[in-house]
Amino acid sequence: MPIQVLPPQLANQIAAGEVVERPASVVKELVENSLDAGATRIDIDIERGGAKLIRIRDNGCGIKKDELALALARHATSKIASLDDLEAIISLGFRGEALASISSVSRLTLTSRTAEQQEAWQAYAEGRDMNVTVKPAAHPVGTTLEVLDLFYNTPARRKFLRTEKTEFNHIDEIIRRIALARFDVTINLSHNGKIVRQYRAVPEGGQKERRLGAICGTAFLEQALAIEWQHGDLTLRGWVADPNHTTPALAEIQYCYVNGRMMRDRLINHAIRQACEDKLGADQQPAFVLYLEIDPHQVDVNVHPAKHEVRFHQSRLVHDFIYQGVLSVLQQQLETPLPLDDEPQPAPRAIPENRVAAGRNHFAEPAAREPVAPRYTPAPASGSRPAAPWPNAQPGYQKQQGEVYRQLLQTPAPMQKLKAPEPQEPALAANSQSFGRVLTIVHSDCALLERDGNISLLSLPVAERWLRQAQLTPGEAPVCAQPLLIPLRLKVSAEEKSALEKAQSALAELGIDFQSDAQHVTIRAVPLPLRQQNLQILIPELIGYLAKQSVFEPGNIAQWIARNLMSEHAQWSMAQAITLLADVEQLCPQLVKTPPGGLLQSVDLHPAIKALKDE
């Protein structure tokens, strides 16, 4: 058989095999189109589980007459126009395949009217070449899509449809998920002429718990803990059920959204499960309704035919952010109120985990802000409940203010007691000295500095090593351990196992958590400066170092680790150098006063100036 271009109908049917799995898939695609059109009311009529009829009517912006034929063509869309748009998608649909694919396996009719038009127009595709016919019709502003006799021309696909009840249950679940994503939209669902679901729009700032309770049940609402967790361009909002009261029925409630798009993502589920694992049994699952907002440039939604999955460009960052957000809510349940007496309250040892330098924990920082209202509160019982924090109902991404981002990155100052705000002092009030101003980068890893008219060279790798040693050295409290996404399992000798067991308490202070069995050791958590390292190389070297020691001091181990960490910067930039020096000045002020050998070298310009003048 020679190579030939497939007929449009055949090509569309092949595409429909990926997009149109069952009637619920059709409902999902069409309702998402309505939401992208700005609809505030969507009516969904289903007959015989969607096999006979699926009708979606909305009050969105509508489609112009001259664009109706394009709407039923493949790869025609108003959502994106360039590669840049594809890399920062904020709409639910973008491929332009859904209507063409659905019309190839059903009798689809599209009726629409825009506010500028005096009359509505109806379009449908038919024939082998999928030619589109357009004719006048009566219709208010908005769009109606009717899908009749789904899979009528593909008997094999129609044969594998389940019972009417099962197919409608799948549609009902899709509508529940969409209703949880858009509280600002009224959604009505009917089956065989009977209204089954009515979700009324909630006004801005109104009560969201009524719809949450209607979809997830009062049992979930009574155990729900509200989350509002933010860092820079990442925001996590929603609810997670108290794991101490999770039941098998509640465990079925697992709804996750990324930039308003409903998602089934293993990375997100793993982060939530890991945060709850200490309170859940081996056979239990957490219950949650969570909304993640992220810079659209940092997530790829074009990786799954039905757009059920996404890929994060910085998956570990997102995982740790969600883990810390959920964990903070659960820990808040166990903490007592902050005392308000006159005794000084020690600030949490968060300095090593809140540095701007590479390897820091961007998210272990509830104390890194000025005192504000709680960002998360347990949802009260039904009745007279105040409105819980809720993500913006409108889809899309909004950049956070730069000032807020800067405040989130500040290191918390030791807190003596709660009192009226006073004028803030400079961050280095007790150590007003600094290395100076960064002029440029020399030989890729040295910073040329100017201070009080003097010029000096600073070795950035050496400064980074001192910073990491300070981050790793425990103070009054152990260094915060961060669980690994995938624990590292290594085979060890009897001598190495014995050394590890002797050093276990010292390693725990450094944030290194492990479990050992007969011949293996499993590294479960490491401090943040180690998260970006190649642990397959570093940990065996650390075990070899410990096997040669007889005394295990956390400070000595931290020094060894700092000296053996690989630098993340083969070529340093000005911004990276400035950030590093700011961290060193705050965390290691003694280096400014008495720089160790190999860190700082003054540069004498007088001979060069003299030579120029002599010329």
Swiss-Prot record:
CDD domains: HATPase_MutL-MLH-PMS-like, MutL_Trans_MutL. This is DNA mismatch repair protein MutL. The keyword Hydrolase does not apply. Residues 363-397 are annotated as: Disordered. The gene is mutL. It comes from the Bacteria. SUPFAM superfamilies: ATPase domain of HSP90 chaperone/DNA topoisomerase II/histidine kinase, DNA mismatch repair protein MutL, Ribosomal protein S5 domain 2-like. The lineage of its organism: Bacteria, Pseudomonadati, Pseudomonadota, Gammaproteobacteria, Enterobacterales. One of its GO terms (molecular function) is ATP-dependent DNA damage sensor activity. Residues 364-391 have a biased composition (Low complexity). This protein is involved in the repair of mismatches in DNA. It is required for dam-dependent methyl-directed DNA mismatch repair. May act as a 'molecular matchmaker', a protein that promotes the formation of a stable complex between two or more DNA-binding proteins in an ATP-dependent manner without itself being part of a final effector complex. GO terms for cellular component: mismatch repair complex.
